[in-house]
Amino acid sequence: MIETDVLVIGGGPAGSSAAKHAALGGAKVILLDKRSEIGAPKRCAEGVSKKGLAKLGIEPSPRWITKEIDGVRLTSPDGTDVWLTEEEIELPEAGYILERKVFDKHMAMDAARAGAEIRIKTLATGMDKIEDGFIVSTESMGKTEEIKAKIVIAADGPEGHVARWAGLKGSAKAKEMESGVQYEMVNVEFDREAVIEFYFGSCAPGGYVWIFPKGDDIANVGLAILQHKATKPAIEYLDDFIAKCPATKNAQAVELNVGGDPVGGMPKKMYDDNILVCGDAAGQVNPLTGGGIISGMTGGMYAGQVAAEAIKEGDHSKKFLKKYDKITRDDLSHEIDKYKKVQEYMLTLSDEELDNIAHAFQDVNFEKISTTELVKALVKVSPKALLKLGKFI
C-alpha cells in the first residue's frame, strides 16, 4: 500500500494549486488525475483576470496566453450593444484568454516542481474511512492500487464523487447546474479582436452566449444555459446562434467542448475529518459568469496550505481543518453570494427588459468597469434591480 500525507484527487487548476501549496508547506503529496493528459479536453471559455493571477503569484506566460483582453461588449436581444473598452474607461478586471490545455499542464508542473508526485491516467474508484485518514482505491491502466492518506483534498469537479464518498454534500443541485457547450472556431469576424462578447436573453435561457477571441480569426464560441429554463438542448441553442450571428455565420468549428457549471454557490460544509473540498467540487464559481479558474485555484491554495499545517501539527480533525472553510469563505463568499443574487435577478428579466436596460446603459458614463461596477449601473437604471441588489453596492 502506498502512503502519503496529502492525496489530491483531480488535476485541474484547483487540484494543482492545492498540491503545489501542500508540497510547499512541507507535506508529502500525491496528485491523481484520471486523464492521460492534464488539461485535455478543456471545459471552459478560458478567461482569467490579471488581478486574479497576480493574487495567486502566477506570472503570465506567453506559452499559455492566447490573447490579452482590453474590452467587453454586452449585447441585448434586440442587438443593442454596450461597449466597455480600455480606450474610454478603466478595466480593473481586464485579463487574458488562456490556452487551457497548456495552462493546466503548467500548473501541474508547478506542483511537481514544489515536490508533489503526479499520477496521470489514474482513477479513484472508491474511498474507505480509517481511524486517521482514508484508504483510496485506484485503477491505472489495468492495475489496481490503494493509497493511504492522512488528508484527502477533493478537486474532482462538479460531477465528482469524492466529497460524497466522505459523506459531504455535492456542490450543486441539478437545477443549479448549467449545461455548457462550446466550439473553438476559425474564420470568426470580429468588430474588435481584443474584446470579449456576451449575448443575453432567450438565445441562452438562464445564461448567456460568449465569444472569446483567441487569435486574429479564432475564438471560443459557446453558451451556458439552465436546462429547466430551456426548451431544447444547449447545442441546438448554440448552433442557432452561430447561424444568425454576423461574427460566426461563416466560421467553422475545429473543436467541441461540453461540461457542467455549478452556479449554486459553495455548500454549507467543505471539510470534515481528514478531507477538504475545493474548486468546482466546492462550488467555488462565480454564479453570474460561471468563471471558476481563479476562485477555484484560490480555494485550492487555501486547502493546500491548511492541509500542510495540519500535517505539521499532527491534527487532521475537522476541528483543525475548519480553518480552511473560514479562510475560503472570508475571501470568496461575499463575491459569490453577491453574484448569485445578480444571477437570480437576471433570471427574472424578459428579453424586453434586457433591451430596456441596454438602452438605458447608453446614457451611463462609466469611469471604470468591473462586474461590481456593472451591478451599480444596473441598480441605477432598473428600480427592480434596486429592490433585489441594493444591499450589495
UniProtKB/Swiss-Prot annotation:
Its EC number is 1.3.-.-. FAD binds at A14, D33, C44, A45, G47, R100, A124, D280, G292, I293. Pathway: Membrane lipid metabolism; glycerophospholipid metabolism. SUPFAM superfamilies: FAD/NAD(P)-binding domain. Its cofactor is FAD. Binds 1 FAD per subunit. It catalyses: a 2,3-bis-O-phytanyl-sn-glycerol 1-phospholipid + 8 A = a 2,3-bis-O-(geranylgeranyl)-sn-glycerol 1-phospholipid + 8 AH2; 2,3-bis-O-(phytanyl)-sn-glycerol 1-phosphate + 8 A = 2,3-bis-O-(geranylgeranyl)-sn-glycerol 1-phosphate + 8 AH2; CDP-2,3-bis-O-(geranylgeranyl)-sn-glycerol + 8 AH2 = CDP-2,3-bis-O-(phytanyl)-sn-glycerol + 8 A; archaetidylserine + 8 AH2 = 2,3-bis-O-phytanyl-sn-glycero-3-phospho-L-serine + 8 A. Belongs to the geranylgeranyl reductase family. DGGGPL reductase subfamily. Is involved in the reduction of 2,3-digeranylgeranylglycerophospholipids (unsaturated archaeols) into 2,3-diphytanylglycerophospholipids (saturated archaeols) in the biosynthesis of archaeal membrane lipids. Catalyzes the formation of archaetidic acid (2,3-di-O-phytanyl-sn-glyceryl phosphate) from 2,3-di-O-geranylgeranylglyceryl phosphate (DGGGP) via the hydrogenation of each double bond of the isoprenoid chains. This is Digeranylgeranylglycerophospholipid reductase. The lineage of its organism: Archaea, Methanobacteriati, Methanobacteriota, Methanomada group, Methanobacteria.
